[in-house]
Amino acid sequence: MLQLGATTPSFDLEKEIDATYPTEHISRALIEEVIPTFEGEQWQVPPMFSAVKVDGKRAYKLARQGEEVELKAKLLVIDEIEILRFDEEKMQLELRIVCSKGTYIRALARDIGLRLNSGAHLIALRRTRVGDICVEDCITFEQFTTLIDNEIK
């Protein structure tokens, strides 16, 4: 889920909002026009708060030390991007995204905000699939602990 109209240095809730932007011009029609432009191959600059290595050091460590470095854009693929819900009052946008390995959804939030001539950051993320493993095929934490307890007995 994206919060439109504000950005953070980490592109998510890890850091406080550092800037706010107009949202009066953002409508469902504009979102429906902009979102499909993200399907296909995209060049994406990773967030500073990421595990990408810069001269052998993790970018997030450098960012936490206050150092700014230029990260190189990486080619990725967004196979599908679908609008699930847009709350015009709260300026929150929920999407379903099928993407390639290495895609930073936080950076995608940033890029969507920019294309909407505003800002955006990620406020919620739920992975529903990693490779061939789908959330529907998984067990809950409670089910896991029950299995472990039964194995120990």
Enumerate the language-model features and the residues they cover.
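Catalytic/RNA-binding core of pseudouridine synthases
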Residues: M1-K153
